[in-house]
């Protein structure tokens, strides 16, 4: 990654933060848990199609998102996803070897010292609740021993970009300046908790961080 591209991504992060503050009553907590330099993996619950922008604006460092290949290939948005360094992932059923290619891309990003962001649920929540994390985190961490920073996002369920009240993006926007809360938690390493327990532990941490955001919004 060239120095100018890094500068562009840092500038975009600041612009996105301002836009998120305009669109939402946006609060961010625990930014200091992300390392100031070096690689890290951020995991968060997946509520809406705005999640990536909210997380990107709330993070103190640019994030490289792992996202579905069909969305990445959107004719009007592909240039943007490439600019911010998004990492596409395709179904093994449609493209044998796709998972390995994505793991290679994630590993390359981490070894460049980037922060990679994944949504372990693998899809938008259909009901506002956090669903079981899918496999994949272990494969990433088996290749690269980086700190994992859990994050919990609250307030976007109910937006037109979520599945609340019907399919996401198939409804008219009905909320403006809604309260949105993002909480980052202390980082952990794969060595602390191994195997399936790692996923369960991270899921529990993300649930707790989302609950903190829900409580904050309820008391505003």
Features from the language model and the residues they span:
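Cofactor-binding loop segments of dinucleotide-utilizing enzymes, especially the Rossmann-like FAD-
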Residues: 45, 68, 121, 153-154
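Glycine-rich, phosphate-binding/catalytic loops in enzymes
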Residues: 57-61, 133-137, 201
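Catalytic-site beta-strand/loop segments enriched in glycine and acidic/polar residues
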Residues: 107-140, 144
């Amino acid at each position: 990654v060239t120095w100018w591209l890094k500068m562009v991504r840092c500038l975009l992060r600041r612009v996105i933060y301002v836009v998120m503050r305009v669109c939402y009553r946006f609060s961010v907590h625990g930014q200091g848990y992300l390392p100031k330099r070096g690689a890290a993996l951020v995991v968060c619950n997946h509520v809406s199609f705005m999640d990536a922008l909210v997380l990107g604006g709330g993070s103190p460092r640019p994030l490289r998102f792992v996202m579905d290949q069909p969305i990445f290939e959107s004719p009007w948005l592909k240039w943007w996803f490439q600019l911010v360094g998004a990492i596409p992932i395709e179904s093994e059923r449609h493209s044998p070897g796709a998972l390995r290619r994505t793991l290679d891309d994630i590993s390359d990003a981490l070894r460049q010292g980037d922060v990679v962001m994944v949504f372990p649920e693998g899809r938008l929540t259909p009901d506002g609740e956090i669903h079981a994390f899918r496999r994949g985190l272990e494969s990433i961490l088996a290749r690269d021993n980086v700190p994992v920073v859990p994050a919990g996002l609250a307030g976007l369920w109910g937006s037109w970009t979520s599945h609340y009240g019907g399919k996401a993006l198939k409804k008219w926007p009905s909320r403006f300046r809604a309260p949105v809360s993002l909480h980052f938690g202390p980082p952990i390493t794969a060595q602390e908790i191994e195997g399936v327990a790692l996923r369960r532990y991270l899921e529990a941490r993300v649930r707790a961080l989302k609950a903190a955001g829900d409580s904050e919004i309820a008391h505003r």
